[in-house]
């Protein structure tokens, strides 16, 4: 019989540490709120100093243990500096790495230029890959490590409006989660990916304001609506909890049923 004491341990992040990238707004912000609610001590980074300071102030008023750094994740030196800061704050140990930061420039494939490719790869994929490398010794030292990648349904099925480069970066994150789950299991580190459908954030606002695009998306989504940030953050944080200790290498869609709903692509003549 499982005791109440054991139940609390399984559903608590008390005493654990976390790094969440791009977390001053949107889904990242919701992830921080959820992690803090379970007792984690968190460090975040964001490229916007204004948003970072605003969010840190809000969390301080709520009594959350959150610190933050301004960081351009496309910069190799800035990524290294961030991890040095994290190591110093958390005494060389880290339990949770959430690779949340991501960008999207949706275009037809023939219209992409070299800068678009570099922009997506460096932000969505290279940064996440490098953060995993840098955090490995800290995650291993903690004795309980969990990596969560914020992927997308665009990395699972073809979503033309998101663009091919965005889709390939998210698909790569799903595969990276599988590889790390196998390679780093011996070090006590799990890795999973969470793949949301379109979620109500500032980043998705222009898409949702396009009536035809929004209607097209909702017609393929069984639940008939877009997601909320907290509907994604709840799964992200679950994957970090001891209760999820046997889950690794998975890509889990938070999509209102989009990826299991059959639909046909009809190209324009």
From Swiss-Prot:
Keywords annotated in UniProt: NADP, Oxidoreductase
Binding site for NADP(+): 19-43
Residues where substrate binds: 152
UniProt-listed Enzyme Commission number(s): 1.1.1.-
Metal-binding listed as a keyword: no
Gene3D superfamilies: NAD(P)-binding Rossmann-like Domain
Active site, renumbered: 166
Broad EC category: oxidoreductase
A Pfam family: adh_short_C2
Alphabetized GO MF terms: oxidoreductase activity
Record InterPro entries: NAD(P)-bd_dom_sf, SDR_fam, TR
Family: Belongs to the short-chain dehydrogenases/reductases (SDR) family. SDR65C subfamily.
Name of the protein: Tropinone reductase homolog At2g29320
Origin organism lineage: Eukaryota, Viridiplantae, Streptophyta, Embryophyta, Tracheophyta
